[in-house]
């Protein structure tokens, strides 16, 4: 009676192996991560200017593309994508990095309050300034935000490289995406760790943005410190092989 009991697992293992081989031979049956839509679905285009363009100004390729869209499937737009004039991918990225515990509603509210606080502070400064100084005061919070982040972006960074059993901090040039990430990370870290207990996040963040806008503040100092460390370790630049 023991032989049939041993044959049953062997039969099932052989069947599982056969199914696995069949799946490998048919890649269309394999599960792909995030394959919510079939390959024939096109990406959504969220751009009002594209749809407002007159037909007479369209090229032959654009006309063909619009005719093709009438018969093709289009993916649903993400909940975070919008065609609003206030939509900004950089601010959206900063909001996602500032979010904690998946509470994006709170992160959006804090970001909106921060931009409002920046605008209020600049308008107070604008009203108190003379006619000549008013022309030099920026009041657009979106421009202030972008300029502040640009001032915080480091040009060169340090990467640990193992050489002879020791890790050396080798200076390397940073990509644009990495620069923007470090600027956002430093700004958020400064507002969280060095914020007074009774100071709200929008107030602290608006203050740091205005400081960075004028090339001042701890975030700018942190960028300069990284540049100094990279300058001090420039003798190790030959360890960079990529």
Swiss-Prot record:
Q: Where, subcellularly, is it found?
A: Mitochondrion
- What's a GO cellular component annotated to this UniProt protein? mitochondrion
Q: Does the keyword Ribonucleoprotein apply?
A: yes
Q: Which residues form the signal peptide?
A: none
Q: Which domain of life is it from?
A: Eukaryota
On this chain, the residues bearing N6-acetyllysine are 228
One Gene Ontology term of the biological-process aspect is: mitochondrial translation
Which UniProt keywords are present, listed alphabetically? Acetylation, Mitochondrion, Ribonucleoprotein, Ribosomal protein, Transit peptide
Q: How does it assemble?
A: Component of the mitochondrial ribosome small subunit (28S) which comprises a 12S rRNA and about 30 distinct proteins.
Protein name, please?
A: Small ribosomal subunit protein uS7m
Q: Which organism is it from?
A: Mus musculus (Mouse)
């Amino acid at each position: 009676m023991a032989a049939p009991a041993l044959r049953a697992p062997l039969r099932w293992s052989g069947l599982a192996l056969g199914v696995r081989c069949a799946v490998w031979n048919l890649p269309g049956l394999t599960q792909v991560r995030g394959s919510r839509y079939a390959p024939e679905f096109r990406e959504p285009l969220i751009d009002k200017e594209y749809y407002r363009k007159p037909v007479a100004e369209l090229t032959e390729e654009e006309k063909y593309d619009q005719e093709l869209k009438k018969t093709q499937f289009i993916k649903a737009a993400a909940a975070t994508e919008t065609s609003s004039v206030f939509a900004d991918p950089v601010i959206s990225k900063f909001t996602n990095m500032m979010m904690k515990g998946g509470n994006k509603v709170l992160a959006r509210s804090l970001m909106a309050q921060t931009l409002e606080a920046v605008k209020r502070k600049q308008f107070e400064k604008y009203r108190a300034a003379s006619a000549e100084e008013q022309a030099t005061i920026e009041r657009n919070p979106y421009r202030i935000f972008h300029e502040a982040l640009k001032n915080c972006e480091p040009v060169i960074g340090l990467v640990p490289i193992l050489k002879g059993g020791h890790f050396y901090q080798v200076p390397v040039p940073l990509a644009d995406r990495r620069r923007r990430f470090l600027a956002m990370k430093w700004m958020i870290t400064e507002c969280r760790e060095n914020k007074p207990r009774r100071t709200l996040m929008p107030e602290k963040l608006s203050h740091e943005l205005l400081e960075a806008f004028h090339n001042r503040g701890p975030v700018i100092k942190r960028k300069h410190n990284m540049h100094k460390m990279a300058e001090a370790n420039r003798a190790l630049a030959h360890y960079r092989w990529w």
